[in-house]
Amino acid sequence: MSTTTQNIPWYRHLNRAQWRAFSAAWLGYLLDGFDFVLIALVLTEVQGEFGLTTVQAASLISAAFISRWFGGLMLGAMGDRYGRRLAMVTSIVLFSAGTLACGFAPGYITMFIARLVIGMGMAGEYGSSATYVIESWPKHLRNKASGFLISGFSVGAVVAAQVYSLVVPVWGWRALFFIGILPIIFALWLRKNIPEAEDWKEKHAGKAPVRTMVDILYRGEHRIANIVMTLAAATALWFCFAGNLQNAAIVAVLGLLCTAIFISFMVQSTGKRWPTGVMLMVVVLFAFLYSWPIQALLPTYLKTDLAYNPHTVANVLFFSGFGAAVGCCVGGFLGDWLGTRKAYVCSLLASQLLIIPVFAIGGANVWVLGLLLFFQQMLGQGIAGILPKLIGGYFDTDQRAAGLGFTYNVGALGGALAPIIGALIAQRLDLGTALASLSFSLTFVVILLIGLDMPSRVQRWLRPEALRTHDAIDGKPFSGAVPFGSAKNDLVKTKS
C-alpha cells in the first residue's frame, strides 16, 4: 500500500456492498452460535429428562461435530461450484431445521440425529461464510474480515445464555430450541440481497464450472470406493460417539479407520499438496481439543461444581462469550499488524497465564471469575477468529470453500472428543481441574504447530515440488516454506 492509502482509516477502504456482505454473513454466524450452544446450556435438564449418563449427555454435544466433516465437504463444494451465497443460505436452513427438531425430540437417539443435522449446517456456514467475507474484503484487511466475522458466533452464544435464563425456568428446555428457528426468516431475506464474493466472481467469469472436491471424490474413477469409505466413516463415528461402545480398543481401531479415510480423501482431492492439508487438519484438531472442553462443559461446571443458579450461570457465560467476541475482533487487528501466525502464537501464550486461575479461585466471587474468563477467552478462544484466514491461505480460490470446510471440520472432530475426554477425566478428578489441565497442556501443542508453520514445513519435507511459498489470500510469505539457513541468506542478500 502507498503512504496515502495507509493514512486512510481501515474502515474507509470498504464500500457499502462489502459492509452489507459482511453484515449478512455475521448475522448467519450469530444464528449459528445461538443454535449450536443451546444444547450446552440445557445439558443437565436434557440429561435428567432422558435419564442419560454424563458421557451420553456429552455425546449430544459431540454429535454436531461428527457430521461436520461431510457438511463442510458437500456445502463447501456447493460454494466452489455455484457461489458462496447459495451455500450460506443452504447452511443456515439446515442448522435451523436441526434446532427445531431438537425441541420435538422424544429421546436420546432422535436428539442425536437432530444434532447431526445441525453439525452439517454449521460446517457449511463456517466454510461458505468465511470464504465469502474474506474474498469480498481487500487483501490487507482479511484478518479483520475473518476475526470480525467469527465474533458473531460468540455473540450468538452470549444471546443464547441470556435467553436461557429467561425462558428455561418458565417454559422448560424445549422452548429454547423453538426460539432458535425464529431469526431464519430475516437471515434468508438478507442473504437474497447480497452480492457474490469478488474473488469467486473474478475466478469464474466466463469460465466452465470448476471441478470440486465432490466431483473428484464422488464422480471420479474411485467414486464407488469413496462412497463405501464415506459410509464406513459415518458408521464408525456413530459407534464411537453415540455412547454405546465401552471397549477402548474398539474405539481406537474405529478412530484409526476414520483417520485413514480422511487422509485418503485429502490425498485424492489435493494431489501433491496433501501434506499441507493433513497438517492443517492436525492443527484444527488440537485447536478444538484445547478450547472445546471449556466451551462445551463450562455451563455444567458452573451449575454442578459451583452450584450457580440459571441467572448466575447466564451472567458468567456473558463474560465468557463477550470475551471471545472481543478477542475475535482484537485478533483481526493483531493479524493484520503482526501477521496471522505471529498474532496467533502471542495471543495463546498470553492466555496460558489465566487458564489455571480461572478454575482455581472457585465460585465465591462471581465478578472475579467473570473477569478472568473474559480475558482468558479473549486471548485463548478469540484468536481463533483468524483461523479461517490462516487455513484459507493454503488453498486456491477454486477449492477454498471445500478445502477450508473439509479441513476445518475434520479437525473439528477434536470438538467431539473434547467434552467426552473432559467428562471421563472428571470421573477421577473434579471437573474444573480436568478442564484446566486439558486446555493448558494442549494449547502448547497448537502454539508449536502454528508458530513453526508445520503445514508448510511438512509439505517441504515430503513433497517440495508442490510447495506454496506465499499465502494465497494476502500474498505474505510462509515461514515454514524456507529452511532457516536459506531464510537468513535471503535476508542478507536483500540488505546488501
UniProtKB/Swiss-Prot annotation:
Gene Ontology, cellular component aspect: plasma membrane
Membrane topology: Multi-pass membrane protein
The keyword Transmembrane is assigned to this record: yes
Residues annotated as transmembrane: 22-42, 58-78, 92-112, 116-136, 148-168, 170-190, 224-244, 247-267, 278-298, 313-333, 353-375, 406-426, 431-451
The entry's keywords: Cell inner membrane, Cell membrane, Membrane, Sugar transport, Transmembrane, Transmembrane helix, Transport
UniProt-annotated location(s): Cell inner membrane
Gene3D superfamilies referenced in this protein's UniProt entry, alphabetically: MFS general substrate transporter like domains
Reactions the enzyme catalyzes: N-acetylneuraminate(in) + H(+)(in) = N-acetylneuraminate(out) + H(+)(out)
Keyword Metal-binding: no
Coiled-coil stretches: none
Sequence similarity: Belongs to the major facilitator superfamily. Sialate:H(+) symporter (SHS) (TC 2.A.1.12) family.
Name of the protein this chain belongs to: Sialic acid transporter NanT
Naturally occurring in which organism (per UniProt): Escherichia coli O157:H7
Gene name in the database record: nanT
